[in-house]
Structures are given as C-alpha cells and as structure tokens.
Amino acid sequence: VDQIDYYFLGGNTMDGIIHDYRYLTGKAQMLPKWAYGYIQSKEQYYTAKELAEIVRHYREIGVPIDCVVQDWNTWEPGNWGEKILDKERYGDNKECMEEINKMHAHSMVSVWPNMNAGGKNHQEFFDAGYLLYDYATYNAFDEKAREMYWKQAKEGLFDEGFESWWCDSTEPFSGPDWNGGVKREPWERYELVGGEHKKYLDPAVANAFALMHAKGIYENQRKDTEDKRVLNLTRSGYASGQKYAAMLWSGDTCASWDNFKIQIVEGLNMGPSGYPYWTLDIGAFFTVADKWQNRGCGCNTDPEPKWFWQGKYNEGVKD
C-alpha cells in the first residue's frame, strides 16, 4: 500500500531545526573556497582558448573572477551528452585550464545524464544495459552505472583539466515542457513533465534521480582524489543532497520583475530544506526570441541591477 511518512523536527531556533535535519540526512560538505566567489557563465563558449581569454580579460580590467563555466556543446557535432571533448575546439583544453589556474581562477563544465546514440559513451552504457528505457538516459539508481558515468567524466573532462561540474537537466525528463507556443499553467506543466517521467521511472523515486546522480559524482570523485573538493552545480535536487556537495540553481529563467520576485522566495525556501548552497542566473537566462516571448519571457533590463545586488549575497555568485 502506498503511504507517506511524515517526520516532525522541533526546535527553539531555525538553526536548531536545521541541525536536527542534517543529523538525519547528512552534513553539508565544504565546497572549494573559490566556489563562494564570482562564477562567470554564458550560453556558450566555443573553445578552450575562449575560456582562458575570458579570465584574462577580467584580470586586465580589474574585475574579480573565480570560475569560468563551459556550458554545453563541448562534444563533437551530433554527439549530445558525450563526455569526450571535440579535439578541434578543445584539443588544448588541459593547457588552457592550467593557464586559467595560473591566473588564480578555476573552471566548471556542463555534463548531462542523457547521450545521443552513436557516441562512444552512449555505446558503453548501452552494451552494459545501464540505460533507462528511453535508451538515452543512464540509470543513476544503479551503482555500477554511476561508476561508469564517473569513469567517462574523469577520463574525458576531469583529466583534461576541468575542476567542477554543472550537472544540467537532472530532472531528467522535462523535454516536453520546452515545446509549445504559449505559456502553460503550473498544473499543466506538472502533468506534462510528470507524465513523461512515469514512462521511464517509478513515480515514487523519480524525484530522487538528481540525488543519485549527485551521489555518483561526489563519491567517485572522492575515491579517485582527495586533492580537490567536489562542486556540483545542479538544476534539481532532493532531500540529503547537501552531503554530496550539491549547489542548486533555480534553472532557466526569464527577465521580469515577477520572475525576480520568485527567485527571492525560492532561495529563502531552499535554506530550511537543508541545502546551504543555492544560486541563480543573475539577470535571467533566456534571450529574446519569439519562441520565449510567447511563453511569458520579456526583454526587461530594469531588474538587472537589483538582481545582481541580490545575487552577490548568494552562496555562489553566478552571472
């Protein structure tokens, strides 16, 4: 019989309640010191040299920067989700990452749980039977699958100089919500995305996919090396994710005062859920295009200054 268990945690202070919650679910990990600084990100940079040039430019103009982020598309054309760099654009990645380190900055790279058929990473998962039944997304609930995912990430990205992880699309079946010509009501989005998840995951555990994904990244990196602390910037999470060095961000947003207001509320709600690390895309994510304007996005730049003022007090300042 399906049931829900409720746990009540009482305390005289909010700190006391969070202490008890983390006693049950796990202590928050200490992130790399630089992770609490300024994180520069955009969609997207196209070469390893460009990443190094961004850091160099910041140093030249005297603006502090602690981390530069490589968003998606590091793979060869057509090999979505591969953790193997396109050698034409990233053949000198290790040297460029070393150059970034010499400028006292660090790097982060986007990784995805799904892979297109035809790539080496995908084929390895397919041959081992470690894919969910969309035959694209790896089964993060399987320990051996998590080990394989890390092995690929280490060999293709970590050993090539990238230092931390941007675990994108960790829902992971939110694809249908990206389609459609108009903005949907929240209940419509819930039903659409929930229905897609039910095709491939038991609804009772679907929300925990991001947690198991973070578990694999954290535990396997720590097995391989204790020289670098783990940082996982992730789009989704679940109870106890703080013990896997997860920093959540609020996802792909659009520029409006209403959306900015929501960010403040989300950040306040995240703290009592046990996650001390949360951030957002300062100034929002979406560019102006008909597709997004019709779904509620605008080109309002007025919130930008206050968005930055608010964002700089987050645990990670992601711009």
Functional labels for PLM-detected ranges:
Residues 1-319:
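Catalytic-domain carbohydrate-binding cleft regions of carbohydrate-active enzymes
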